[in-house]
Amino acid sequence: MEQKKYFFAVDLGATSGRTILGSLSDGKFDLEEMTRFDNRLIETGNHFYWDIFALFYEIIAGLKLVAQRGIHIESIGIDTWGCDFVYVDKNGDILRNPLAYRDPHTFGVMEKYFDEKISREKVYEKTGIQFMNFNSLFQIYAMRKAGNVALENADKILFIPDALSYMLTGNAICEYTVASTSQILNPMTGDLDNELVESLGLKREQFGKMTNPASIIGTLTEEVQKMTGLNAVPVIAVAGHDTASAVAAVPAKNEKFAYLSSGTWSLMGIETKNAIINEKSYELNFTNEGGIEGTTRFLKNICGMWIYERCRKEWKDEATANQKDMKSLNHEELIAEAMKQPAFQSIINPDDACFANPSSMVEAIKQYCKKTGQHVPQSYGEFCRCIFESLALRYRQIFTWLKDFADFDLNVLHIIGGGSLNQYLNQFTADSCGVTVLAGPQEGTAIGNIMLQAKASGLIKDIWEMRQIIANSLELKKFEPKNKEAWDEAYEKFLKVKG
């Protein structure tokens, strides 16, 4: 039997984080959650910040547990959300906690940037990244306009996973996948775009050296070794952007696949050799984010389970206020009720602006259906059926666009993330898109993180061996398309309702 090798993954999301111990032996992997913790926004002075020092402390706490158990880990890897960053001064010290992408300081800044610096069309032509007001390009510009003191004193600018790796090793890098979310990176050159960097009043050297996933950043500093009880463990640049790590974990057999990272927010896309930047991708606001081994993740953001989660929270709050039994609000009960309802009574566009953050999601759905002349949902089951069917129809629209963009056939749709556990939505997606769906893994981000560490250690040759190991370690659930005529008719209704 092959000796088991251990790897330590740090997986940070916008609301919570985890440290995970991954092991690899005999062509299979295993995961063990070491710690789980909240990632809280700090609100002060009308701004929202991330507590980078608290996150560092949580990583140290996870590493201490590993040391206490006497486990030898080969390496450490960190993935996080994109866009946000930390300023470091010339002495190597972090300049205050980083602003969070949810902070309102970027509202209205995009249009000012286009008017005063570089046009919208040219920015997309250079980066191929969808326009979001919180992209790093606009965050830094907003801070420059405001005379931000930390920016003015910054010697280095590090994206969040790179900042945490820096705190562990003392080495500053710029990992490719997370840098691609900034809207400053040019995928054609594989580096930050000089014109965009200069438009912010910065120099290229203020960002770290561009580093590809599965590269060694350095080893734990002596200080961190003393804090944790570990030796000089290597820290690896994995795919620092969590979605890139998740897509690396798609257990595909060849390149002819699409993926759907399904959670509160969903991302549907394809893996390509080159960025797709043209008039149609610009018009439809598709994005080209960095993948591993030189690939591009060509994708589009979708609302995901956000609407369902918000409705369920409202119902729970109402039940609590009225001292009602909450059994009917269990996830399984709600899905069972949804399946009892007539099909396609009510259809919404999940990405309509009215569902972005309404005071009442239930009321927003009612008003949308009333406005479009449809049956207005009344019961929990009717609401859930409406949400799941509408999501599947929106997935179909984007899958149809992806088929037009791809220069290869899309024979399968891989669904990864927490949403892959919703078997009814998986079947609806297969039916709606007319394609075989393979669901799993649920823990895609952590798995991708660990597999890239294994690649850096020399245990894995390339992405396809990585994906084969993942496929060998999991039992994927398969969903074949059914009810074509009914879904075709519903899709026509969706397009009319959507407008």
For each predicted feature, which ranges?
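N-terminal glycine/serine-rich phosphate-binding loop of ATP-dependent small-molecule kinases
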Residues: 1-96, 108, 125, 225-235, ...
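Active-site core segments that coordinate phosphate-bearing ligands/cofactors
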Residues: 2, 9, 21, 114-127, ...
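Short glycine/proline- and acidic residue-enriched helix-loop micro-motifs
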Residues: 45-48, 120-130, 206
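Short beta-strand-loop/turn "lid" adjacent to the catalytic site in phosphate-handling enzymes
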Residues: 64, 68-101, 130-134, 161, ...
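Short glycine-rich phosphate-binding loop at a beta-alpha junction
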Residues: 72-80, 156, 209, 407-417
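Glycine-rich beta-strand-to-loop/alpha-helix junction loops that act as flexible
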Residues: 79-84, 213-214, 262-265, 412-420
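Short alpha-helix plus adjacent loop in nuclease-associated cores
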Residues: 99, 103-116, 451
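A charged, well-structured terminal subsegment
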Residues: 135-141
